[in-house]
Amino acid sequence: MKKSKKFGLIGKNIDYSFSKKYFSEKFKKENLDCTYSNFDVVNISEIESILQNNSISGYNVTIPYKEEIIKFLDEIDEVAKDIGAVNSIKKIDNKNIGFN
């Protein structure tokens, strides 16, 4: 049996965000076995433990962590390097790879 995929949003004070509702509805509409959670991070130091969770397939990143999160990632793509910010992270072979 295929395992449910987990995704989430990393940010601060993100209760206002439409992402959880949007992606949850999209997964249901597309009949995808996926969940989406908010990771409301008060302090940047919390991010490392969140990213170590290998059961989560990917994240969206919002303010104020788009730049600060880079130091916690294993790799970032060229666009993210050029911009100096990451807005999505994909877990590939237990590595966190940032994209923009």
What residue ranges belong to the model's regions?
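Phosphate/diphosphate ligand-binding glycine-rich loop within oxidoreductases
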Residues: K2-N100
